[in-house]
Amino acid sequence: LTLIGIAVGVALVCAVLALRHESERALSRDAGLYDLVAGGKGSPLQLVLSSVYHLDSPTGNLPYSDFKRFQRDPRVLWSAPVGLGDNYSGYRIVGTETQFFDLPNREGHPFFEFAQGRVFEDRFEVVLGSQVASSTGLELGDTFFGTHGLVEVPGAEVHRDFPYRVSGILAPTGTAQDRAIFGTLASVWEIHETEDRLHSAIQGSALLEGHQKRETTAILMRLK
């Protein structure tokens, strides 16, 4: 019995160490994609977890003009906005722009590859991470509705007036991007601005001046 107990104990320790090593490798793969992440004031860890790993809540928003400014900066090789707010079956819908998929790896080759389809072209087209496609069973041309919030919660508001259509499915990357749904930042703006106008009309109040200024949750960057 002692020998069996030792063997089981050693096996458990080895399994934990292997899982830890694999987790560290996965975290390093994600962190190595970007050099800088810009976001609202708050915890730097929370900012990275929410915008890179799709795990935590965002720290706040930035004006979209900040993204355009970074995009023009000669020190920036690549940049892309990240807009959060909705999910589908627990997978976050990430609003961004087409250059998101132009991200190069550290050898200068494209990081993202399409297993099927293409990048989004219309406002409510989306690209699925590999895990999203395999878990949900969504295929090219399928449509679905996003749900308000970053996680799946019973009774959460479903945006039934704004159907998404799948235009592409990414090849596995071994990163958190496999667990995300990528759509246009413009679609995120349209959904939530429409809701704000509706809620204001119901409450009999006007939107605050400047409320509808374009914003982004975070900005991902790779430097030259």
What name fits each language-model region?
Residues 35-39, 92-95, 125-127, 143-145, ...:
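Soluble periplasmic/extracytoplasmic beta-strand elements of cell-envelope proteins
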Residues 7, 11-102, 110, 118-122:
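Hydrophobic, regular-secondary-structure patches
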Residues 44, 99-102, 134-135, 152-154, ...:
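Short beta-strands and strand-coil junctions in structured, solvent-facing domains, enriched
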Residues 158-165, 169-224:
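Mechanotransmission and gating elements of multispan inner-membrane complexes involved in transport
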Residues 84-89, 113-127, 144-175:
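Beta-strand-rich non-transmembrane domains
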Residues 99-110, 127-146:
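Short, solvent-exposed hinge/capping segments at secondary-structure junctions
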Residues 3-5:
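Small-residue packing motifs within transmembrane alpha-helices
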